[in-house]
């Protein structure tokens, strides 16, 4: 939030409070899905991609439904998609974010230009074998579902390596009957696959399915797949990526282009048809969502400077910005409906931030 505000302060000072375009800072609601388990809630409502039926049934850990929580603060859930009008004339969207990974750290670089966000194929895979006594069943007579599932672990590393920049993760594994004296009858694993290119993501998925069938057959088992979630890759605007790369090089002397494995609000804005780019700041330890998550202050300062440079290079003849705090930020109200919109994104998990984003 502060980075976007600082950029707007510079713009306001440069144009004596009357910039030629409107620039807004948007504070998206519940990117992480922290309260209701639905990621990208605010941005998906704005992009029009929010599944209203699904969101209507979301419940927090206290049993409160999302529509009821919104109603308590005066927001009609059935109208949340109305905020999509804020993107109707948007010319550009810029988002600054920590990398949440080790790529920039390993290269000893403070900042990076983001090529886009990975598409995701997420499935539950269940291998079906036969329960049998662990003592009386010879090894060559077993139909061990866990054996078939376990063979997938090294295989997904080969699949990811063949794809180039793709990643594959088996994140969970459960067995039945789950007792020490029985061969595993059923083994369920979850597989998360991600890639920036749609075709390569499809290839990774097809290779994983083929491997599962092969390993199941070799173990005397069967296998079934259940899609848990899918989202297409969101490649960012090439011109904006170039501008971002230039701004970083002007600030730091060197830049690096990388994809984003995690999803971000920028993906929703991009899929809504708005030219989009992200800038990453190095994460210390290459770790996020952990108590040791941190970023160097000097890198944060560089990111604000680079964001400011990017905003200058990206401004069209006329421009609009989404205001998180109209009393603080630039923008004169002189812009017309044909104005462009450049948005510097700020991350906030509290519901108040979500509601603010939806109602601005």
Model-derived regions, located:
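Flexible, glycine/charged-enriched surface loops at secondary-structure junctions
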Residues: 16-22, 80-84, 136, 157-170, ...
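Midchain, well-structured core segments that form catalytic/ion-binding scaffolds
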Residues: 30-31, 35-199
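Short beta-alpha connecting loops at secondary-structure transitions
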Residues: 53-54, 194-198, 228-230, 286-299
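His/Asp/Glu-rich mid-to-C-terminal helical/loop segments that flank catalytic regions of hydrolases
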Residues: 115, 133, 137-163, 205-210, ...
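A short beta-alpha structural unit
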Residues: 169-179, 190-196, 222-241, 261, ...
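Zn-dependent metallopeptidase/amidohydrolase metal-coordination segment
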Residues: 185, 255-305
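Solvent-exposed, non-transmembrane alpha-helical starts
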Residues: 200-204
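Intrinsically disordered, low-complexity acidic segments enriched in Asp/Glu and Pro
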Residues: 315-360
């Amino acid at each position: 939030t502060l980075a976007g505000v600082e950029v707007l302060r510079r713009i306001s000072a440069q144009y004596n409070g009357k910039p030629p375009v409107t620039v807004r800072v948007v504070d998206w609601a519940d990117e992480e899905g922290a309260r209701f388990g639905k990621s990208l809630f605010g941005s998906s409502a704005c992009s029009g991609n929010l599944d209203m039926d699904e969101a209507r049934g979301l419940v927090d850990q206290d049993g409160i439904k999302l529509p009821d929580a919104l109603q308590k603060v005066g927001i009609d859930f059935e109208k949340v998609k109305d905020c999509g009008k804020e993107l109707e004339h948007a010319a550009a969207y810029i988002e600054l974010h920590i990398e949440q990974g080790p790529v920039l750290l390993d290269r000893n670089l403070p900042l990076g230009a983001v090529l886009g966000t990975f598409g995701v194929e997420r499935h539950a895979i269940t291998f079906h074998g036969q329960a049998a006594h662990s003592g009386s069943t010879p090894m060559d007579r077993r139909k061990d579902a866990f054996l078939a599932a376990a063979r997938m672990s090294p295989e997904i590393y080969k699949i990811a390596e063949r794809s180039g920049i793709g990643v594959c993760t088996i994140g969970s594994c459960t067995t039945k009957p789950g007792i020490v004296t029985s061969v595993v009858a059923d083994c369920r694993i979850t597989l998360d696959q991600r890639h920036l290119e749609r075709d390569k993501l499809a290839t990774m998925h097809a290779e994983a399915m083929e491997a599962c069938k092969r390993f199941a057959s070799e173990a005397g088992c069967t296998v079934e797949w259940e899609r848990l979630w899918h989202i297409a890759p969101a490649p960012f605007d090439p011109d904006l990526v170039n501008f971002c790369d230039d701004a970083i090089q002007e600030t730091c002397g060197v830049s690096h282009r990388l994809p984003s494995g995690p999803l971000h609000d920028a993906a929703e804005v991009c899929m809504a048809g708005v030219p989009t780019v992200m800038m990453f700041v190095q994460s210390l330890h290459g770790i996020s969502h952990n108590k040791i998550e941190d970023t160097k202050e000097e890198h944060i300062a560089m990111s604000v400077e680079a964001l400011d440079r990017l905003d200058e290079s990206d401004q069209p003849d006329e421009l609009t910005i989404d205001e998180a705090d109209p009393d603080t930020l630039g923008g004169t109200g002189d812009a017309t409906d044909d104005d462009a919109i450049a948005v510097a994104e700020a991350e906030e998990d509290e519901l108040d931030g979500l509601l603010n984003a939806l109602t601005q």
